Amino acid sequence: MPHITLSEDGLIRIIQRIVKSRGRVRLGIGDDAALLHDGTVITTDAYAAGAHFDLSYMTLHQVGERCACGAISDIVAMAAEPEAVLVSLALPHRALCPAPRVRRRAKVLSIEQQVRQLYSGIDNICAEMGCEVAGGDIIVTDHLLLALTVTGKTRTPKFRSGARPGDTLYVTGYLGSAEAGRIVLAEEARSRKPGARGRDGERRSSRGDWRLPLVSRHLRPVPRLRVMGELKPLIHGLIDTSDGLATDARHLTEMSGVKIVLEADALPILPATTRFCTCRGSDPLSFVLGAGEDYELLFTSSRPIPSSMKGVNVTRIGSVQHGRGLWIHRADETMPVTASGYDHLKNISNNGKTC
């Protein structure tokens, strides 16, 4: 039987055809979160060691923070305020030795220590976002897994389907930083040699040098709740950049039935990200189109948006037009975007084996 790859979007469409609406949910599968008729917003995100976080360079406290940021960002991407977090935690039978890079000798963590570190990280983000851990479940299994369910509330939700022809496309913050930081940390963890030189010929330690902003954006993304209050009345279509600019902008085009044209020269890229790409001989534009997990807000509006709101950069990066598909304008040429971002199923075939 031939191997047929199945995308995450393809699997979602299959699930949508299987499950039936019974009128209890205002908006179900297909957006950043589900929406009930009373304005309650619900999302859930699963995270697995090795796939979504790497214990070779992260502490469990950092894992908890990062997972909480990712899940809460989906609530913010519905223009809602987070309220409660439920944590389902699968702990490995064996003791963990996370993040040997942050200490000279790896420290074996008991189950109690694992729980303390993970939950302290999650609760730290909850404190910043004004929500709280309200329960969950804990089991013991072979690998470390977390699933976070977050609820929130909104009177004026925003959807991926809200973009309109004539709108302008905006994004908060910077693009590509988190993925660049992940690669920097992964390379450093693989080297395991203090002061080893990387591909750029400079000292490998990411601490205290130009890579630090990238590392920080990977380890500690920030859900953009702080600016949502001011942005909400201005927004038409909304999504967060969890899967990468190309994938998430394409979601806006498909759900809204519009054409989006990105302006290549307008994309906000940190100098450190540009330097990271230059060191590797890669094109910064191609990199940021596919780089995910920045958790910035990607939105459309017909109103002018200030370039800075509550200390967060907001950049005009494109336009919404009549038509279909995602396009990019670069050097006097407009072409379709073929790059894609993160897909959970990209290495899985239809029979469950790795392609």
Regions found by a protein language model. Give the residues of each.
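Residue-level signal for inorganic ion chemistry
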Residues: L35, A71, A79, V133, ...
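General beta-strand structural signal in soluble alpha/beta enzymes
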Residues: L27-G28, V41-T44, E132-G136, V150, ...
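Short, acidic (Asp/Glu-rich) active-site segment that either coordinates a divalent metal cofactor
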Residues: T44-D45, F159-G195, S206-G229
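N-terminal glycine-rich phosphate/pyrophosphate-binding loops that anchor nucleotide-derived ligands
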Residues: M1-V76, V337-S340
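Short coil/turn connectors at secondary-structure junctions
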Residues: R22-G23, G30-D31, H37-G39, A80-E83, ...
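Glycine-/charge-enriched secondary-structure boundary and capping motifs
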Residues: P2-R17, M58, R94-C97, R104-E132, ...
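Glycine-rich anion-binding loops of enzyme active sites
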Residues: H37, P82-C97, R103-E188, S319
